[in-house]
From Swiss-Prot:
Binds 2 magnesium ions per subunit. Involved in the biosynthesis of branched-chain amino acids (BCAA). Catalyzes an alkyl-migration followed by a ketol-acid reduction of (S)-2-acetolactate (S2AL) to yield (R)-2,3-dihydroxy-isovalerate. In the isomerase reaction, S2AL is rearranged via a Mg-dependent methyl migration to produce 3-hydroxy-3-methyl-2-ketobutyrate (HMKB). In the reductase reaction, this 2-ketoacid undergoes a metal-dependent reduction by NADPH to yield (R)-2,3-dihydroxy-isovalerate. This is Ketol-acid reductoisomerase (NADP(+)). Its EC number is 1.1.1.86. NADP(+) binds at Y25, G26, S27, Q28, R48, S52, D82, E83, L84, Q85, G133. The gene is ilvC. It catalyses: (2R)-2,3-dihydroxy-3-methylbutanoate + NADP(+) = (2S)-2-acetolactate + NADPH + H(+); (2R,3R)-2,3-dihydroxy-3-methylpentanoate + NADP(+) = (S)-2-ethyl-2-hydroxy-3-oxobutanoate + NADPH + H(+). It comes from Bacillus cytotoxicus (strain DSM 22905 / CIP 110041 / 391-98 / NVH 391-98). The active site is at H107. Pathway: Amino-acid biosynthesis; L-isoleucine biosynthesis; L-isoleucine from 2-oxobutanoate: step 2/4; Amino-acid biosynthesis; L-valine biosynthesis; L-valine from pyruvate: step 2/4. One of its GO terms (molecular function) is NADP binding. The keyword Oxidoreductase applies.
Length: 336
């Protein structure tokens, strides 16, 4: 079982007087910066010119170029998209790190897969809240917190663990609990969850169910409701209390169908395929493929995305959601 740390386990003064640079001001960046500031950390924000720059300034932060922020900071937290981190690190962060600094991430992808190679004389750790930035911020302001993971990759100063816990405490995570892990474990489990279950697995299952009903002659609108729309109701029940809460809450007919039909859909063959997915994550095959795809301009990514956006389930869904303004997205979806 994971070791869990709380507020009482933190050396609160280990980052006292240290300057923290938050590189990036998106979902996680704004939450980290604001929570740290509210906990009396000395925070600056490092960005390239754009909307985020203006937003950070509006929120009252001193904003600098990434290079300037990295040069003045003792702790540099990189909260950029995975695919952008290596370029920004090599161009603007690496040469500005000083001995004894801390280089921090919220996901281990680039360090674990050797896209970022930190100097040997800096501490390297990750602090990864297990929730989106808006939730990290909202729960903090309400006196609560989102749990987080932390891991130490390199302990150059002998105090990397203490710094990681102090940072986690600064964003409020120790109120809920901070679980110790490794860069390898965090990266590989995160990627597996996304690919086999949360994104890849669920979308493939939803589409397969929809197509099965439509191919059998059922109206696509009903297929959409049964295989996609109602998924949120079930996931919310699991989120609140696990599988047992979902099974307690649905009808006995639905629960019996779960027991007798679920194992026929997700079979041992499915688990073997999941094992293959995990192996490709572990041996770096997935990372190499994604890095190459990004460097080539993402031709397959964009082609698949465009095709998926025109699947019948999406066409029908867009029409049905016009009937349900309460589920309309708050942000633009579709092409990236």
């Amino acid at each position: 079982m994971a070791k869990v740390y709380y507020e009482k386990d933190v050396m609160v003064n280990v980052l006292k007087g240290k300057k923290v640079a938050i590189v990036g001001y998106g979902s996680q960046g704004h939450a980290h910066a604001q929570n740290l500031r509210d906990n009396n950390f000395d925070v600056v924000v490092g960005l390239r010119k754009g909307k985020s720059w203006e937003k950070a300034k509006e929120d009252g932060f001193s904003v600098y170029s990434v290079a300037e922020a990295a040069a003045m900071a003792d702790v540099v937290m990189v909260l950029l998209p995975d695919e952008l981190q290596p370029e920004v690190y090599q161009a603007e962060i690496e040469s500005n790190l000083q001995s004894g600094n801390a280089l921090v991430f919220a996901h281990g992808f680039n360090v674990h897969f050797n896209q970022v190679t930190p100097p040997e004389d800096v501490d390297v750790f990750l602090v990864a809240p297990k929730g989106p930035g808006h939730l990290v911020r909202r729960t903090f302001t309400e006196g609560g917190a989102v749990p987080a993971l932390f891991a130490v990759y390199q302990d150059a100063t002998g105090t990397a663990t203490e710094k990681a816990l102090s940072y986690a405490d600064g964003i409020g995570a120790t109120r809920a609990g901070v679980l110790e892990t490794t860069f390898k474990e965090e990266t590989e489990t995160d990627l597996f969850g996304e690919q086999a279950v949360l994104c890849g697995g669920v979308t493939a299952l939803v589409k397969a169910g929809f197509e099965t009903l439509v191919d059998a002659g059922y109206q696509p609108e009903l297929a959409y409701f049964e295989c996609l729309h109602e998924l949120k109701l079930i996931v919310d029940l699991m989120y609140e209390g696990g599988l047992e809460n979902m099974r307690y809450s649905v009808s006995d007919t639905a629960q019996w169908g779960d027991f007798v039909s679920g194992p026929r859909v997700v079979t041992e063959h499915t688990k073997k395929a999941m094992g293959d997915v995990l192996k490709e994550i572990q041996d770096g095959t997935f990372a190499k493929g994604w890095i190459a795809e990004h460097q080539a301009g993402r031709p397959h990514f964009h082609a698949i995305n465009a095709k998926e956006n025109e699947h019948q389930i999406e066409v029908v869904g867009r029409q049905l959601r016009e009937m349900m303004p309460f589920v309309k997205p708050k942000v633009k979806t579709g092409v990236k």
